Structures are given as C-alpha cells and as structure tokens.
From Swiss-Prot:
One of its GO terms (cellular component) is cytoplasm. This is Imidazoleglycerol-phosphate dehydratase. The keyword Nucleus does not apply. One of its GO terms (biological process) is L-histidine biosynthetic process. GO terms for molecular function: imidazoleglycerol-phosphate dehydratase activity. It is an enzyme of class 4 (lyase). Belongs to the imidazoleglycerol-phosphate dehydratase family. Keywords: Amino-acid biosynthesis, Cytoplasm, Histidine biosynthesis, Lyase. The gene is hisB. Pfam families: IGPD. It comes from Halalkalibacterium halodurans (strain ATCC BAA-125 / DSM 18197 / FERM 7344 / JCM 9153 / C-125) (Bacillus halodurans). It comes from the Bacteria.
Length: 194
C-alpha cells in the first residue's frame, strides 16, 4: 500500500498525519479547524484515500498556522507515499459542480511545484474560517508534494460551495493522477525521472 506518516512539531503546531493513496475513503480527523476538517473529510471520500490527522495548533490566534501546516504535512505525505512515481498516470483533471458553482482542478505530479489559483471568494469568511487560507493550504500542498496544481472556478456565488467544489475536484484529479496504469512502464516521463 502506498502510504506515509508525517510528524511535524513547531512552536505553533503539532501534527501527526497518515495518508494512504490506495484507500477506501476513510478519515479520522482532528484538526482544530472545523471547516478544514469538513473539507479534508470530503477530499478523502471523493479521492478514495485514507487520511488520519491529529493536529493541535494556536487556533486561539487564528487558523492560519494550522491550515498552512496541514497543507505542508499532506503534501509531504503524498510525495513520500508515491515514492519514485513508477507506473502512475501522473496527470489528472476533474470538473465538479456544486449547485451554482463549477470548479476545475488539473494536476501534474511532475516534481515541479506550482500553483495557479483562479478562484474569487465572494465572502472573506465561512463561519470563522478565513477563506484566503484556501490558497495558503493549496500552495503548501503543491509545494511539498512537488506538484503542478491548477485551480479554476468558472463561476459560483456561495463561498462554501466554491471551496467544497475545489476540494472535491482536487480529490478526483489526484485520484486519477495517482492511479497505477498497467500501460505505463517505469516513470511517466521521457526524461526517465520525475
């Protein structure tokens, strides 16, 4: 099973995260950031991953450090779980509608980190969660997973729907990109490595 555990402890957060690429959509999440718990739960379900998180952070300040470090840890776990990336499809894309919203996510597990984020958030907050943290989480995820990640929201009015559609599309795109393709011999690159 392609799986990794990451332990991260700083002056701001303490996180233990276990991620399995080949899962059943099961999650056991304690993040201290309820909205991120919700998003990571549906990410796990729609990507058919398994994810366990035990996180404590300085949420009395705000959710920034915990959300950022969750992205770091998930990115590191994805990179470690995929190891040399032999046999994977490498690319994945998904469109996900949620009511009035349509989100698109495209990924390339290229070892070349980049985030292209084209999503306007109508509201600065969903509940107590700062919506600008979605970009922060995704950038740290892309950076640490060494993934090229494009997020495009074609339209949408409800901020919760926009963010939820992004996370579901991310899950489906990563599920596709991490799938082992029996036609792929070795690493999916003409360079012979990623």
């Amino acid at each position: 099973m392609r799986k990794a555990t990451i332990e991260r402890k700083t002056g701001e957060t303490q996180i233990s995260l276990t991620f399995a690429v080949d899962g059943e959509g099961q999650s056991n999440l304690t993040t201290g950031v309820p909205f991120m718990t919700h998003m990571l739960d549906l990410f796990t379900k729609h990507g058919h991953f398994n994810l366990t998180i035990d996180a404590k952070g300085d949420t009395e300040v705000d959710d920034h450090h915990t959300t950022e470090d969750l992205g770091i840890c998930l990115g590191l776990a994805l990179k470690e779980a995929l190891a040399d990336k032999k046999g994977i499809r490498r690319y994945g894309s998904a469109f996900v509608p949620m009511d009035e919203t349509l989100a698109q996510v495209v990924v390339d597990l290229s070892n070349r980190p980049h985030l292209e984020f084209r999503a306007d958030m109508p509201s600065e907050k969903v509940g107590t969660f700062d919506t600008e943290l979605v970009h922060e989480f995704l950038w740290k995820l892309a950076l640490e997973a060494r993934m090229n990640l494009h997020v495009i929201v074609h339209y949408g009015e409800n901020t919760h729907h926009i963010i939820e559609a992004i996370f579901k599309a991310l899950a489906r795109a990563l599920d596709e990109a991490t799938t082992i393709d029996p036609r792929v011999k070795g690493v999916p690159s003409t360079k012979g490595m990623l």
